[in-house]
């Protein structure tokens, strides 16, 4: 019988270490999410920041950038923060702080919003408001799992009973869509906070497009970013800054991680 020590245990020290090592842009975006939750206690601020289709056309273009930061309550906010943090931290560690900041305050917010507005206004002719960072979670999951599907095309589910003749396999790239459907069902049953099926699907479309490389041109040129980083000495001046040139500096400006005989993977340090 396995001992208690063999099971994963919560460690406050490891959690504290993980939080203290979060890269800069991840910290900033999560801080803005929390700040919007505090400000959202006011109904006026909620209305100002939501993505409301007809309000956008009426001059509220800021809404296509503000809606991912806004949440309907504490449970909605904290659950999205917990789910978003590892995905956002990984993205920033792979692409750099400046690229992450530009994409998440720009195209990764505005492109899903534009798709949502087009469908709401011209196809369904509705005016349903949406808000929440779950659109970023779906976007990042879609891009990550699409990339993972190249090396692991299927995710194998364990047999619910040993007498079943075969295992069940799900296409790895389809998992975000399955999660979208499940969260929508659970939301309708009032088990989860309110979610937008259409909004999540718009986030998935942009995530898949990024994973396929169709919209990689949205990322700023690395040559320009290197010039800015070198000119301002961002890596040396700003704590937790991640350089865009990962091959040279590695994560947080240290040597690149390696799986070679003489190297130790960063995640095991």
PLM regions and their residue ranges:
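A cytosolic-side transmembrane-helix exit/cap motif
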Residues: 122-127, 153-159, 216-229
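A contiguous binding-surface segment within folded domains or other stable secondary-structure elements
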Residues: 162-166
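C-terminal transmembrane module of polytopic alpha-helical membrane proteins
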Residues: 1-23, 34, 167-269
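Membrane-embedded alpha-helical segments of multi-pass membrane proteins
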Residues: 78, 132-141, 198-205
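Short, well-ordered alpha-helical segments in soluble proteins
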Residues: 122, 141-153, 182-189, 209
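Membrane-interface micro-motifs in multi-pass membrane enzymes
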Residues: 126-154, 168-172
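N-terminal TM1-TM2 helical hairpin plus the immediately adjacent luminal interfacial "cap"
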Residues: 10-131, 190-199
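Membrane-interfacial alpha-helical segments at the cytosolic side of multi-pass membrane proteins
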Residues: 81-91, 102-107, 140-150, 205-215
């Amino acid at each position: 019988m396995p001992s208690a020590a063999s099971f994963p245990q919560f460690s406050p020290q490891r959690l504290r270490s993980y939080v203290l090592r979060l890269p800069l842009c991840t910290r900033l975006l999560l801080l803005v999410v929390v700040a919007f939750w505090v400000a959202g206690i006011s109904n006026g601020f909620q209305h100002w920041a939501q993505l409301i289709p007809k309000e956008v056309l009426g001059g509220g273009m800021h809404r296509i950038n503000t809606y991912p930061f806004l949440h309907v309550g504490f449970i909605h906010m904290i659950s999205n923060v917990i789910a978003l943090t590892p995905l956002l931290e990984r993205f920033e560690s792979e692409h750099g702080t400046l690229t992450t900041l530009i994409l998440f305050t720009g195209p990764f917010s505005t492109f899903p919003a534009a798709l949502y507005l087009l469908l709401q206004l011209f196809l369904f002719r509705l005016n349903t408001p949406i808000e929440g960072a779950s659109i970023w979670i779906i976007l990042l999951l879609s891009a990550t799992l699409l990339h993972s599907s190249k090396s692991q095309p299927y995710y194998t589910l364990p047999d619910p009973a040993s007498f079943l003749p075969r295992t069940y396999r799900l296409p790895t790239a389809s998992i975000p869509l399955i999660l979208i459907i499940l969260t929508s069902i659970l939301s309708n049953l009032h088990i989860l906070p309110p979610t937008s099926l259409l909004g999540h699907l718009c986030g998935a479309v942009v995530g898949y497009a990024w994973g396929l490389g169709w919209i990689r041109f949205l990322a700023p040129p690395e040559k320009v970013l290197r010039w800015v980083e070198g000119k301002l000495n961002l890596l040396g001046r700003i704590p937790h800054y991640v350089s865009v040139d990962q091959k040279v500096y590695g994560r947080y400006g240290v040597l690149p991680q390696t799986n070679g005989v003489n190297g130790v993977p960063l995640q095991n340090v």
